[in-house]
Amino acid sequence: MADKRDFYEILGVSKSATDAEIKKAYRQLAKKYHPDINKEDGAEAKFKEVQEAYEVLSDSQKRANYDQFGHAAFDQGAGGFGGGFSGGFDDFGDIFSSFFGGGGGGQRRNPNGPMKGQDRFMSMRIDFMEAVFGANKSVTLNVDEECTSCHGSGAHSKDDIKTCSRCGGTGQTVTQQRTPFGVFQSQATCPDCGGSGKTITKRCGECHGKGFNTKRVEVDIKIPAGIVTGQQLRVSGKGERGANGGPNGDLFIEIVVGTHKHFRREGNDIHINIPLSVIDATLGTEIEVPTVHGDVKLTIPAGTQPNTKFRLREKGVQDLRSGRMGDQYVEVKLEVPTKLSRQQREHLEALKETEVKGDSVFDRFKKAFK
């Protein structure tokens, strides 16, 4: 059997990584290799490898054991605990359980308790207007749902569920080895019951003993108005299957918002550039400006300069939390004609003649340097 890879190496973090760094690395890798997203060969194996690493490193006690003993802390038959004691402890199983996370006084952590399933991650691309006003979307997923026939037990009836004879219902087996250095003891999941502490004499005919059925379901996703790229939506119970009757994990959907041809969003404000002729900027005019809420009349005062910005109050995006509306900013971009008719040129030449009598714009500019 090939050696297992180092769990820290799998997640791409250092051995001094914080819980937050480990969780962040896991989420990124889980999204990258999830079988529902990544169809490449080997992706599913990598996904399982990432899950196994996170299961250990996200648990402070398991992580401490792993840091001290490596994979041997969880492999059956390995020397996970060095004793070297000649007496004073009658029950080495209790010592081992206490060392590996059980309570004191002979109380062990129940390995058969309900465990929530792993969360599932995916991304969803929506267009600009869907992010502004919200939308209703749907995704199709494979979801493990509790068998309605056996209610998750996997057995044909309650009488077909028996306490595992190998582990006595604990779900764990303990192996002891005596060496010249003392007693080495390890604990592993029971191979007969798979850690459940129960065995089934007759399986459920509906789910064939699994306790669940995999279904292809369509999940409705409500996109709230005002959402931005990077924000996540959570759908409860649509993640990976839980263990020992525990609930399913959750589905997290990271939103990616597309760009718009004309509008640009900054926070809850919308920005747009509008073309304006030199004549309209000089004499002033009234125009209808596109907004995400429809056209709005805007008065351009005479003498408007290039790149002037006008503010349209509450014509932006609704804030996701407070509900307040952002604004829209309209920036003027002057368009200088490249071709003129004879009549237009004559009018402009006449206008230029009136300017020559005084200082031109450029003349006033030069005087500022003297």
UniProtKB/Swiss-Prot annotation:
Cellular component GO terms, alphabetical: cytoplasm
Lineage, opening ranks: Bacteria, Bacillati, Bacillota, Erysipelotrichia, Erysipelotrichales
Pfam families associated with the record: DnaJ, DnaJ_C, DnaJ_CXXCXGXG
Gene: dnaJ
SUPFAM superfamilies the UniProt entry points to: Chaperone J-domain, DnaJ/Hsp40 cysteine-rich domain, HSP40/DnaJ peptide-binding domain
Family the entry assigns: Belongs to the DnaJ family.
Gene Ontology MF terms in the entry: ATP binding; heat shock protein binding; unfolded protein binding; zinc ion binding
A GO BP annotation: DNA replication
Listed name of the protein: Chaperone protein DnaJ
Entry text on domains: The J domain is necessary and sufficient to stimulate DnaK ATPase activity. Zinc center 1 plays an important role in the autonomous, DnaK-independent chaperone activity of DnaJ. Zinc center 2 is essential for interaction with DnaK and for DnaJ activity.
Subcellular localization: Cytoplasm
Free-text comment on the cofactor: Binds 2 Zn(2+) ions per monomer.
Description of what induces expression: By heat shock.
Organism: Erysipelothrix rhusiopathiae
